[in-house]
Amino acid sequence: MFNSAEIIETITMIEHEHLDIRATTIGINLMDCISEDIDKLNENIYNKIVDKAGTLVKTAETVSKKYGIPIVTKRVSVTPIGSIIGSAIKNLEQEDAINCCVEVGKTLDKAAKDINIDFIGGYSALVQKGMTKGELALIESIPLMMKETSTVCSSINVASTKAGINLDAVKKMGEIIKETATTTKDALGCAKLVVFANAPEDNPFMAGAFHGVGEGDAVLNVGVSGPGVVRATVARLDNKDIGTVCNEIKKTAYKITRMGELIGREVATDLNIPFGIVDLSLAPTPAPGDSIANILEEIGLERCGTHGTTAALALLNDAVKKGGAMAASYVGGLSGSFIPVSEDAGMIRAVNDGALSIDKLEAMTCVCSVGLDMIAIPGKTPASTISAIIADEMAIGMVNKKTTAVRVIPVPGKDVGDFVEYGGLLGTAPIMPVNEYSSEEFINRGGRIPAPIQSMLN
């Protein structure tokens, strides 16, 4: 039996501390959609998505109402399009191949809108060791695809611990991000584009979600959200030692994750598809108090970004994993604390106060999930500098055998001190300064940075 205190605690978490299910994401395998005819490919993709995920929104809302727990977004991820587009464009010139990729993106967008989901991920390519013609066409189509769609998210994996860093792909992505910024209002397309090292195959969070080739035909993955709950827990621990803080965070993470497991399994059962994983990531929102930065400040930092921030984030990340792992049958995805600047009111304040820089954020990514996220930079930033920022973050992931990523937004016409307003979960992004010294010669060398010695595990 539950006692009254536990019931009141749960109500408080939901009503006042922003506890919710951030994402219910159906992963769909599109390998059986492959065709040499682009029209047939698009038809197959559309039909498969509608068949597998057509009732996701209705089912999620029914379960949400049953338990009184908000499910914020309903999403779909698909097999990386770069892996299935090749047959349809193998005999086409590059420009025609690019246009075909855009048509597939528009098919994904139409399917997403017709089944009323929020986002669809998987306009992706895995190019950590090299690029096929289809993958190159897909990458080069991203700016136009973002212009023509509103729900499609794109992710490109350019590095891994086993393969090293594909510097040619890193250079290309700097150019693509720069171009995407000019094709969409306030560079919004860049907010739906992420560059990965060691990308997971079962990630429920956008913009990096795709359905890995090792996955089954369909699966439901869940991402929880509870920074406000963790912050409230830490706020009650005045003058307690750090071990006590860690232990209380673990207990809270356990409760949050159990909720995610419960909701995820029920939605999956009602949809008649297998349940996959719970992603243990703490995902902030722009709402007051629902902030990773605020948790770190409750732990004892005057402002997120000051000395000690990396240590505080490391203990938070570890405690969340330990508590969450006990509560879930299967853990996957990114599973760590997210630090997206524009989506976290505490991070925005830290940037405005001069406490938080891109360099400090890079250090923080060494101990958490997932990377340099939702960072707006001056529109004049050269593509080579964006590529170099990506290369640095990929190196952290490659060497430390972890997932890292970059979602950076060069906003045309904006400079340091300006803001760009996206609204909703994407929030408000202050324009952050980048190092003005050039990395162009390094990026132009091209080739592949070899895998580190720690990749040799056998």
Swiss-Prot record:
Question: What protein name applies here?
Answer: UPF0210 protein Maeo_1412
Q: Can you tell me which family this protein belongs to?
A: Belongs to the UPF0210 family.
NCBIfam families registered for this protein in UniProt: PRK05313.1 (NF003700)
Q: Which SUPFAM superfamilies match?
A: PFL-like glycyl radical enzymes
Q: Which Pfam families match?
A: DUF711 (PF05167)
Q: Which InterPro entries match?
A: UPF0210
